[in-house]
Amino acid sequence: MKHLTEMVRQHKAGKTNGIYAVCSAHPLVLEAAIRYASANQTPLLIEATSNQVDQFGGYTGMTPADFRGFVCQLADSLNFPQDALILGGDHLGPNRWQNLPAAQAMANADDLIKSYVAAGFKKIHLDCSMSCQDDPIPLTDDIVAERAARLAKVAEETCLEHFGEADLEYVIGTEVPVPGGAHETLSELAVTTPDAARATLEAHRHAFEKQGLNAIWPRIIALVVQPGVEFDHTNVIDYQPAKASALSQMVENYETLIFEAHSTDYQTPQSLRQLVIDHFAILKVGPALTFALREALFSLAAIEEELVPAKACSGLRQVLEDVMLDRPEYWQSHYHGDGNARRLARGYSYSDRVRYYWPDSQIDDAFAHLVRNLADSPIPLPLISQYLPLQYVKVRSGELQPTPRELIINHIQDILAQYYTACEGQ
């Protein structure tokens, strides 16, 4: 499992390559990603966050072992080699337990790390930046680093115990905004300063030394920083290389380290490529992929309304809206404004809070109904042109089958293609 270390080595040697991390648990997104990586013969990095997947099940209901089983089963069904699959754990630390005293939260974090490592996750993001119930706000670099070193020790011991060798690759640090897109409307974003990045690295190096973990420093492959990219509900802050140039140059002094950029969703292809060139060589993407899934489903629902009598339609859009109104916990604190503004946000926001609702049984039934309705007879080409114009071109050229499932998968892959191109290197 040396794909990441090798990628970093090549990048540091001047190749300007990178890797993207697919941060989603949706089966169609994962199928799209696995098929795309297979077609391009590249390794695939899939990550779960501490919110999605933990030892108690997370919001997906999956433990790390469950998630690995789910992904590996999907990979096997698509003939994707498991040795080309890299699993990562994102924001692993006390994130889920900030309402508990630090001692209790960190005990849970120890178990979280054990469960991820024992399940075979090899890329481990240690993030102890969040304050717990009895902590000062914000935490000092030293406290954050001490807690990360504690978790690294647990990770190393667990890896040796289960696999007989310590081959984990680590990411440290955190971006300033909360994971998964900003809550509030954005106008400008502070880029991590070189001094702050150096302070984080030195605090971690010192804390790792105190834990007797000097030997693993070359396996700390990336530092999470804020290069000045983010999105909120309707806006994207685009990467501005000039603002990040000092930060970009700073990492050139570390021979085994690159940067990891979170919230790169919705950046232009040019910005994604420039991020990789500027050493932000691990690009995280999640909401943009489920946003593309949602776009394709809304387009297919519009096609269905043109072709199928109203009483036989799936009503996917309305079912989705009804379930989100009935169970508002995943969007209520994120979407603001009057009723119409919130309605638009539920359907179309870049932050894509709708992604939390796809596993709901009513919505899943409506999705299956939609696919059945459109699979019965060929979708007329003019309707594909109207509602899925990018896919229409590929259908007409004969490279894409115009079935509902293939249209959805291909629309998601259009986003993956931007990341692949950005990461390919020279």
Swiss-Prot record:
One cellular-component annotation, GO: plasma membrane
Pfam families, per database record: GatZ_KbaZ-like
Database matches in InterPro entries: Aldolase_TIM, GatZ/KbaZ-like, GatZ_KbaZ_carbometab, TagBP_ald_KbaZ
Pathway(s) it belongs to: Carbohydrate metabolism; D-tagatose 6-phosphate degradation; D-glyceraldehyde 3-phosphate and glycerone phosphate from D-tagatose 6-phosphate: step 2/2
GO biological process terms held by the UniProt record: carbohydrate metabolic process; D-tagatose 6-phosphate catabolic process; phosphoenolpyruvate-dependent sugar phosphotransferase system
Subunit description: Forms a complex with KbaY.
Its biological purpose: Component of the tagatose-1,6-bisphosphate aldolase KbaYZ that is required for full activity and stability of the Y subunit. Could have a chaperone-like function for the proper and stable folding of KbaY. When expressed alone, KbaZ does not show any aldolase activity.
Annotated family: Belongs to the GatZ/KbaZ family. KbaZ subfamily.
Entry protein name: D-tagatose-1,6-bisphosphate aldolase subunit KbaZ
Origin species: Escherichia coli (strain SE11)
